[in-house]
């Protein structure tokens, strides 16, 4: 795919020690905000003009999967809200296109609540991808059966635990739109899930986060600094363009990488994880 229509940010990252040398490719989007078509070619910012678009991403993914069928694809939330398509069809277009992209897991952004719980349930039932969120309590809603705290994937002989974190709803979402859903501390929830995934012998633990980078409230930095055992954070919410991975020290002193790709999917993050053989 030509770089003048869709950019892929690329990082090679040595993440964890494993029984033998292995590599794992991850593609990551966040905050696509219903950007169905490419951005206007007339934008003054040439780094954004004529970028992105679902059709281009679908074509790019087809090419990437042809080269590497074992790659993983994740989204960090807020695929909703931002165009007349969302206003008119309430997420059907976005979820339908994401189904064609075959995401391995997606977490929840605050804008997924914009048309209320009933609409979220309707959309999540249509999704052919897992939706993960570990720090919302969905008891008393249909979402309890549709959203998992984590999933475990297997790729290239690796066991990969993936969990989601989402932001505090109060102040971001109208109370009527999230009803009885309870927000729980992301740091405590993250450590609880990591411990479960470690007990299940996961080789790699990935957090898909919609908490945000360098913002008020609990951020990706705070989650990493307050936990141990996370290997990688794929972020969203703050619309931050990270040209390279940012690193935060966890409780064990390990430097943990964080990726985020702005908004509207004009960038798709690509990470190649080099799993080094244990000595």
Describe every region a protein language model picked out.
Residues 1-23:
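Bacterial Sec-dependent N-terminal signal peptides
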Residues 19-279:
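Acidic, metal/ion-coordinating pockets
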């Amino acid at each position: 795919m030509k770089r003048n229509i869709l950019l892929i940010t690329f990082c090679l990252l040595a993440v964890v020690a494993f029984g033998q040398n292995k590599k794992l490719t991850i593609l990551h989007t966040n905050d696509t905000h219903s950007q169905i078509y490419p951005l206007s070619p007339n934008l003054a910012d040439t780094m954004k003009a004529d970028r992105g678009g679902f059709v281009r991403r679908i074509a790019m993914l087809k090419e990437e999967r042809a080269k590497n069928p074992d790659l993983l694809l994740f989204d960090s939330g807020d695929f909703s809200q931002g165009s007349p398509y969302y206003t008119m069809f309430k997420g059907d277009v976005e979820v339908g296109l994401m189904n064609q992209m075959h995401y391995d897991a997606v977490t929840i952004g605050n804008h997924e609540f914009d048309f209320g719980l009933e609409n979220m349930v309707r959309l999540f039932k249509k999704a052919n991808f897992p939706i993960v969120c570990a720090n919302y309590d969905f008891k008393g809603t249909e979402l309890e059966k549709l959203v998992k705290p984590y999933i475990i994937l297997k790729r290239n002989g690796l066991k990969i635990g993936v969990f989601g974190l989402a932001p505090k709803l109060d102040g971001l979402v109208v109370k009527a739109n999230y009803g009885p859903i309870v927000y729980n501390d992301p740091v405590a929830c993250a450590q609880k899930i990591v411990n479960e995934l470690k007990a299940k012998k996961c080789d790699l633990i990935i957090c898909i986060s919609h908490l945000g980078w360098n913002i008020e409230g609990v951020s990706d930095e705070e989650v990493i600094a307050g936990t141990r055992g996370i290997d990688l954070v794929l972020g969203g919410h703050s619309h931050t363009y990270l040209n390279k991975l940012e690193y935060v020290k966890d409780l064990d002193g390990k430097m943990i990488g964080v990726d985020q790709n702005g908004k509207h999917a004009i960038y798709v993050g690509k990470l190649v994880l080099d799993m080094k053989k244990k000595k």
